[in-house]
């Protein structure tokens, strides 16, 4: 009953009245937030604000937490799941720093034959990402495609592979 008619209609009417213009063309509303598999509720005493969660984990971590689930699904908030989101962000940041390092310190010269083949395979990740987003804004699968890309890029651009600056730059871009 929480999100039953006319909840969203009232949100739209209030926003349009306050701002004097059309609200939005697309609007997504995530599922309810559960705390350790129980509905979040002031009456249950398991209520928190976004500011409180951000103080503990950071806003980027909360964003990742939300992106890792489909927007129509309930979100299960727990310390363990927030740590998974934090670790996911750290993997992305580590990959970025790794690419930046090799853009500055990799071998000079053109892409090698192996690197050229790797670069030719990169569009498949964009295709997977776009397919997930086109599938009812499936951010969980889109994030999975990003992490497949990160895994392959980390293998291709590592000290063991002795990459060129050019490969690091292509992957970074």
Model-derived regions, located:
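Feature 926 captures the class I aminoacyl-tRNA synthetase adenylation module centered on the KMSKS loop
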Residues: 18-21, 55-56, 71-173
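Alpha-helical recognition segments enriched in aromatics with Gly/Pro capping
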Residues: 1-100
């Amino acid at each position: 009953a929480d999100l039953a008619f006319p909840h969203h209609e009232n949100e739209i009417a209030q926003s349009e009245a306050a701002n004097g213009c059309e609200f939005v063309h697309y609007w997504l509303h995530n599922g309810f937030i559960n705390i350790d598999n129980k509905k979040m509720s002031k009456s249950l005493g398991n209520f928190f604000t976004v500011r409180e969660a951000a103080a503990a984990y950071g806003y980027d971590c909360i964003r990742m937490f939300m992106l890792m689930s489909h927007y129509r699904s309930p979100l299960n908030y727990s310390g363990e799941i927030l740590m998974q989101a934090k670790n996911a962000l750290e993997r992305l940041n580590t990959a970025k720093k790794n690419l930046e390092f090799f853009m500055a310190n990799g071998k000079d010269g053109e892409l090698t034959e192996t690197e050229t083949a790797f670069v030719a395979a990169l569009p498949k990740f964009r295709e997977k990402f776009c397919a997930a987003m086109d599938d009812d804004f499936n951010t969980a699968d889109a994030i999975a495609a990003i992490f497949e890309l990160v895994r392959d890029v980390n293998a291709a651009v590592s000290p063991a592979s002795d990459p060129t600056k050019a490969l690091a730059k292509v992957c970074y871009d």
